[in-house]
């Protein structure tokens, strides 16, 4: 989930650091997680007679189970002095081939210019009611100067395919603090958006410049603090925080391993302000409980019907930045795999799964999120690389496929009954039915999985899904009811104890 962390940092900065009253700015921020410096963000604004250019660049170093991963991403946004949007770019580097999205704005609507997007408007719902970066800066400065205690507006989220994002800031007080050698009176604001259930506490100058931002991102407290350039860059030299253990979901009752388990029952509870729903898809069937949680039944030997919308979704067969089926090497790899006459489609798909598992022979956390072609060439990766390469094989076979994100049960040091770890696998559509395939496990699929979301990974949907998953870290509870008929919890299905 390291790329999800990177995207949450980017989201915080999308709705925070771009606020400034200056026409020219050069701001450096240090990023810390659990008090450990781990990266920086650099934002600049440059003006010419015809254009205003806002740029941000972020670098992070984190430890994933003893492997240090370096992540970087950045955005640019160009507009004219009247606030007319002209051009924007998003670049994400998670250890594989960098992903780049380019947008223009015909008739004010963002359009993805990447080849796989088909040059179509990506957000018909954006409309005219959103603000560009320079408009946000001017709007916030004016509202603060007017003594406003609540500020609300809409902008575009570049890390979610230019999805409209509603921001609300509430004034909660003031404090004096030394900032870059000067003592300033700062406003304390609480920021929330419709894209996240995580509240962010901010300090801002009277001109709207962000001085600090603090949020509990599930892995611990994350702080983004205005500093000088040297201090910001030094954050990359410090020992990075170890984050893998913080993503584990403990369980108090479970069989030793679930690799061969076919059926299981769970209760799942979300401890968030925002309501969450679990998908009823593939091997997973969900029932809402009166207590507000969910009863989840897994039958790894079964699938579930697709909706009419899913059956008609062209993105499930198309090339994307991560599932790059237009790559010659990827096409050649799957074309040269031997087929077995008489195989059913399900059996043929499982042969693709085994081929991917064997090819990605270097199981490593060193790549946060590589593409299918990255996984093919490097033969390295974790669950994400296995999932996208297998999805590419399915799509090249003419079968709609998507990425599943959720939890998988696995042994974990310090956890008597193992733990659930965040995970990715692949779903494929066969004769109108979704089937689950996990190229990192011994069998096609097993009952040690819990599905939280699915994504075609087209445009910005993959990044959005990953960042949303991070919002659940530390806010999700799982209880095991039974595995392969063995009852492990005698509570009623509502989790309220024996009701007899």
Q: Positions of the model-derived regions?
A:
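Bacterial N-terminal signal peptides
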Residues: 4-16
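Acidic, serine/threonine-rich low-complexity disordered tracts
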Residues: 18-116, 124-126, 141-303, 443, ...
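Hydrophobic ligand-binding cavity/cleft-lining segments
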Residues: 129
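Hydrophobic/aromatic-rich core segments of domains that either
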Residues: 186-188, 196, 202, 386-475
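Secondary-structure boundary elements
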Residues: 136-137, 302-381, 389, 458, ...
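Flexible, glycine-rich surface segments
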Residues: 149, 158-160, 358-413, 422
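Catalytic-site/binding-pocket detector for metal-dependent nucleotidyl cyclases
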Residues: 132, 138-140
